[in-house]
């Protein structure tokens, strides 16, 4: 496609930034529109440095602002929709999550139709598939298995509804008489430089004598490096613009993993930080079944206090299940249809992430140093 343009929502986020860095290398791409609620000065400067033959246009606005979305979509060839509220701990109000993640996606699809944008790629989540029970074991799962998250928690529920809306929109008629083609990518838990979940775990450990909190010692998962997830998006947009490949991809979803070893969340955090003296918590912990029922009791307490006080439990049944299940998936379908092969090996991904973790450790040391002066 000659002289095409791409809109990336959530472009200021952990994944969005990595997609932009790869997008600027695409041939015949004349413009990238980077959309988010707000961009800090450092990120604006980074985007300006990325500009070469490809124009980068920064768009600050609300995903629920219909006129703004219609303007953003004008003369765009491809949309990569990563923008969403990620919240597994119940900090954000349910209505806000549903509005941004579901209504925002629906409004963007409608703007696509009005602006006649033919390609729409949605960043979904592994949580769309589950896990629904820590007793359920899924190893090397695939797209043909009828897996669907049944938790009422707002984040997985909203991502499930949004993905369904995106895939149902495949084949819609566009205003110019063309057709809208869509697909969705379901990445595993994403790690890498800039991960706020990994950053929170490391900083918490640094403030706790180097002891990493146990978040999922009973789990077996296959986390995916952020650079490989970004690469999968590039391959998806290429494939949906390829007349030979596109028919088998339209309306489909794909699990995105890589060659990161299958391990627990706790072991991943330890592997990425042990070089700096951080260590796993060796203290005795409650059995998983007991943790599940304690989570249930905390939910009841939260519900009973709701009329007079907002109590957010440290964990609930959903978090216990999410963090302690055997839940791994294959990327064979993405390999077959998208020609997906991880851009970064496990060793490369580990090295880059460990270097970034080292910068967090150095920053912590500098903070302590300044406090003692």
From Swiss-Prot:
Enzyme Commission number: 1.1.1.145, 1.1.1.270, 1.1.1.210, 5.3.3.1
Protein's job: A bifunctional enzyme responsible for the oxidation and isomerization of 3beta-hydroxy-Delta(5)-steroid precursors to 3-oxo-Delta(4)-steroids, an essential step in steroid hormone biosynthesis. Specifically catalyzes the conversion of pregnenolone to progesterone, 17alpha-hydroxypregnenolone to 17alpha-hydroxyprogesterone, dehydroepiandrosterone (DHEA) to 4-androstenedione, and androstenediol to testosterone. Additionally, catalyzes the interconversion between 3beta-hydroxy and 3-oxo-5alpha-androstane steroids controlling the bioavalability of the active forms.
Protein known as: 3 beta-hydroxysteroid dehydrogenase/Delta 5-->4-isomerase type 1
Family of the protein in this entry: Belongs to the 3-beta-HSD family.
Pathway terms, separated by semicolons: Steroid hormone biosynthesis; Steroid metabolism
Tissue and organ expression note: Placenta and skin. Predominantly expressed in mammary gland tissue.
Biological processes per GO annotation: androgen biosynthetic process; C21-steroid hormone metabolic process; estrogen biosynthetic process; steroid biosynthetic process
One Pfam family named in its UniProt record: 3Beta_HSD
Species, as recorded: Homo sapiens (Human)
Subcellular location as annotated: Endoplasmic reticulum membrane; Mitochondrion membrane
Annotated positions binding NADP(+): 10-15, 155, 159
Active site feature: 159
Catalysed reactions listed for this entry: a 3beta-hydroxy-Delta(5)-steroid + NAD(+) = a 3-oxo-Delta(5)-steroid + NADH + H(+); pregnenolone + NAD(+) = pregn-5-ene-3,20-dione + NADH + H(+); 3beta-hydroxyandrost-5-en-17-one + NAD(+) = androst-5-ene-3,17-dione + NADH + H(+); androst-5-en-3beta,17beta-diol + NAD(+) = 17beta-hydroxy-androst-5-en-3-one + NADH + H(+)
GO molecular-function term, one example from the UniProt record: 5-alpha-androstane-3-beta,17-beta-diol dehydrogenase (NADP+) activity
InterPro entries hit by this protein: 3Beta_OHSteriod_DH/Estase, Lipid_A_modif_metabolic_enz, NAD(P)-bd_dom_sf
Transmembrane segments: 288-308
One Gene Ontology term, aspect cellular component: endoplasmic reticulum
Keywords: Endoplasmic reticulum, Isomerase, Lipid metabolism, Membrane, Mitochondrion, Multifunctional enzyme, NAD, NADP, Oxidoreductase, Steroid metabolism, Steroidogenesis, Transmembrane, Transmembrane helix
Topology of the protein relative to the lipid bilayer: Single-pass membrane protein
